[in-house]
UniProtKB/Swiss-Prot annotation:
Principal EC category: lyase
Annotated site location: Transition state stabilizer: 34, 133
Record's keyword terms, sorted: Isoprene biosynthesis, Lyase, Metal-binding
Gene name in the database record: ispF
Keyword Lyase: yes
EC number: 4.6.1.12
Manner of cofactor binding, per the entry note: Binds 1 divalent metal cation per subunit.
Keyword Metal-binding in record: yes
Record-linked NCBIfam families: ispF
Protein's UniProt name: 2-C-methyl-D-erythritol 2,4-cyclodiphosphate synthase
Binding site for 4-CDP-2-C-methyl-D-erythritol 2-phosphate: 8-10, 34-35, 56-58, 132-135, 142
One of the Pfam families matching this protein, by short name: YgbB
Family designation: Belongs to the IspF family.
Species for this entry: Chlorobaculum parvum (strain DSM 263 / NCIMB 8327)
Length: 157
């Protein structure tokens, strides 16, 4: 068994949709990035890639490549799952933490868990998504951006 950790940060932008965990969350601002800027799925992708010693999301999906402009991070996560499978690994458990002040995402967490589990052919009960504020501290507290952390456990098939 191997453990991976991932973190991702994106700043808010008024001309973007807020996509988190593959769910479009109603919000006056979205996250800025080369792809759809799904901060949660990016952190998970990094955790999985790291656990398998396959590098990071930037290595596999560089933001300098037009191929990934506005890319759907659900598709990127599916690709990460295939890379793990090619190396003989499967995800066992994923635990995540999303930090943002607004909007509240509690109504969307179950769909996010379903999306993540579906992308990686996992049981939804093995995927955890949690959210908290930053108590108005730092860039998250000032609502300048959002951050996500992910920890995963993978094992050889």
């Amino acid at each position: 068994m191997r453990i991976g950790i991932g973190i991702d940060v994106h700043q808010f932008s008024e001309d973007r949709k807020l996509i988190v965990g593959g769910v479009e969350v109603p919000s006056p601002v979205g996250l800025l990035g080369h792809s759809d800027a799904d901060v949660l799925l990016h952190a998970i992708s990094d955790a999985l890639l790291g656990a398998a010693a396959l590098g990071d999301i930037g290595k596999h999906f560089p933001d300098t490549s037009p191929d990934y402009k506005d890319a759907d991070s659900m598709e990127l996560l599916k690709h990460v799952g295939k890379l793990l499978e090619q190396e003989g690994y499967k995800p066992v458990n994923i635990d995540t933490m999303l930090l943002l002040e607004k909007p509240k995402i509690a109504p969307y967490i179950e769909q996010m868990r379903r999306n993540i589990a579906s992308c990686l052919d996992m049981d939804m009960n093995d995927v955890s998504v949690k959210a908290t504020t930053n108590e108005k501290l730092g860039y998250v507290g000032r609502q300048e951006g959002a951050c996500a952390h992910a920890v995963c456990l993978i094992e050889k098939k």
